């Protein structure tokens, strides 16, 4: 079966047949993220992440289950490359600035180094000043999509990219594992989500995806 699949995706036309779903996009564009046989729950997780009609989604999974690679690498790339008109402003949020920088670096690495992306979508920095627009925490693509990384300490409400407010906000591991046993810290997280994140997405009718342990 896999030999036939490999032959089918050997051309751009073949690969394009699968990119309508997040699972298909991952298989043809990010195969290096899938060295192990997927579990049954991966298909369900991808279906939920890839459902544009789900405005509020929380995915809780054990460390190493693939939720972060699906939610913070595959999902923003898929939306930015396949649905730029629907998702022109993608926001990734993590607990700390260092974590934010890592999220953006992972996305940028695929945009710059992934041979399939280069073949099928071209240089996504073409016509964009990489020195100005490709930073440690922000990327603007040639199709106009902006991927912005923010930490919990930074303001979300009122953010704009050109005429666009955030179209999807993806929050990855919003709580530090070392602090999560403290009620005060958990209360601050809930206050932040209710007081900052949810009002921000309500302003623009955006999607909210939260990934946690």
Where are these regions (language model features)?
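Short, flexible loop motifs at catalytic/binding sites
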Residues: 1-213
